[in-house]
Amino acid sequence: MEKRNERQVILFPLPLQGCINPMLQLAKILYSRGFSITIIHTRFNAPKSSDHPLFTFLQIRDGLSESQTQSRDLLLQLTLLNNNCQIPFRECLAKLIKPSSDSGTEDRKISCVIDDSGWVFTQSVAESFNLPRFVLCAYKFSFFLGHFLVPQIRREGFLPVPDSEADDLVPEFPPLRKKDLSRIMGTSAQSKPLDAYLLKILDATKPASGIIVMSCKELDHDSLAESNKVFSIPIFPIGPFHIHDVPASSSSLLEPDQSCIPWLDMRETRSVVYVSLGSIASLNESDFLEIACGLRNTNQSFLWVVRPGSVHGRDWIESLPSGFMESLDGKGKIVRWAPQLDVLAHRATGGFLTHNGWNSTLESICEGVPMICLPCKWDQFVNARFISEVWRVGIHLEGRIERREIERAVIRLMVESKGEEIRGRIKVLRDEVRRSVKQGGSSYRSLDELVDRISIIIEPLVPT
C-alpha cells in the first residue's frame, strides 16, 4: 500500500455484493481526495484485497457458521452479523486509534468512520471513541426515507389489500402501489423482527454526523428536499459513485466470465438483451423456465447471467429443456457471472432485463440502456416504479412470471417504436446524471462539502 501520512477514513461495509461495491467505490473517491483508506471487513464475503493495493484491509471475525453463510434468510444473516461483530469491530477500531510504532498508523489521524446503514451498533462504538460516523445509504434515497415508515404502514392495516385498491398509490411511499406492499413488507412471521430492525437502523442513523447517498439530486430531488422531516443531520448525495473520475477496479465477489465481451463484439449495435437478476435473488424452477422460453421466443440475441445455485434445487442450468441452447442458433449465451459495467457499456447491448437493485439501476441509467423491470424484493419495487412510471425509461413486468409477458416486453423494447421512445428518454436522463459528477454538478458540489466536513479532525479517545 502506498504510504500516506494524512487523514485516515475507516470504512466498514456489510458483507453483501450490493454493499461492498458501493463502499469500495466510495473508498476510491475519498482516496482521490487525499484520504488514506482502511477497510474493516468480515470473514464472510471478504473483498479481494489484492484488487485494491492502495487500501489497508483488516479482517474481523463474524461468527457465522457455514450453514448461516448459505442461508437465503437475509434478515437472519443481518441480525447474526450485528450480534456477532460488535466486539470484534470495537477491538479493531481500538487498535487503529491507539498509537503503535509497528502499526504504521501512528501518523495518520482518523477523520471518521463510514459504514452501511444496516450496521446498527457502529454509532455507539464510534461515539465511545469520540469519532464522527457517517452512514452510507446505498439505496435510492426515496426508499431509504420511505422504508422507515414500514412499521407505521403495517400498523395502519394496509394489508391485505382489497383488489379494488391494488393500483392505488401508497400516500406515505410514492410511487409505490398498494399491491407492492405485501412483497416489500414480508410475511406476517417476518413483521416483528423486520420492524424492530428498521427502528434500530433509524435510531442509529439520526445521531450520525451525516448520510452519504449513492444517488444525485437529479434522481432524488423530492426525497432529498423532504429529508429534514426525518433527519436533522447533513445529507450528501454524491452518486453515482462508479462514474466519478477515479481509476476503475474490480470489486465483484464472483468471477466474471470475460468471454461475454468477444461474444458481444460479434453482435449488431443495440441488438442484445442483457439479463441479470443480481447477486442475491433466486428463482423457482418454473419461473426460470418461463424466462428461458420467453427469451427464446423473442428471436432476439440475449446474454443471460444465471448464478450457480440461484435456481432452487439446481446447481446451475441443468433444468433447461433438452436441445434448448442448440435451438437458439447462436443467439443466446448463458454465463455464471458477467462484467456488468462492460456489458452495459458495450454498443451491442440494447436492453437490460433486471431485478432493479439500485447498483444495477444506476449502471443502466449511466450507460443509457433502457430496462425491463422484474423486481424481486425490498427496494427493487420502488426502483421499478420510478423507472417505469416517473422517469419512463423502462417497462415493468408485473404479476406472475410468464413467457408471453417476457416475450412481449422484449419485443416492445427492442423492436417496436415504444422502445425508441424509451431509449430517447433514458439518453436524456443519462446525460443529466453524468453531468452531476462533473465539476460544478450537484454531486461534485456535495462531494466538496463532504470532504470539507470529514477533514475536520476530532481527536479520538485513545483506549487505555
Swiss-Prot record:
Superkingdom of source: Eukaryota
SUPFAM superfamilies (alphabetical): UDP-Glycosyltransferase/glycogen phosphorylase (SSF53756)
InterPro entries: UDP_glucos_trans
Transferase listed as a keyword: yes
Annotated EC: 2.4.1.-
Uppermost EC category: transferase
Residues of the signal peptide: none
GO MF: cytokinin 7-beta-glucosyltransferase activity; cytokinin 9-beta-glucosyltransferase activity
Residues that coordinate or bind UDP-alpha-D-glucose: 279, 338-340, 355-363, 377-380
Alphabetical keyword list: Glycosyltransferase, Transferase
Family from the record: Belongs to the UDP-glycosyltransferase family.
Name listed for the protein in its UniProt record: UDP-glycosyltransferase 76C1
Source organism per UniProt: Arabidopsis thaliana
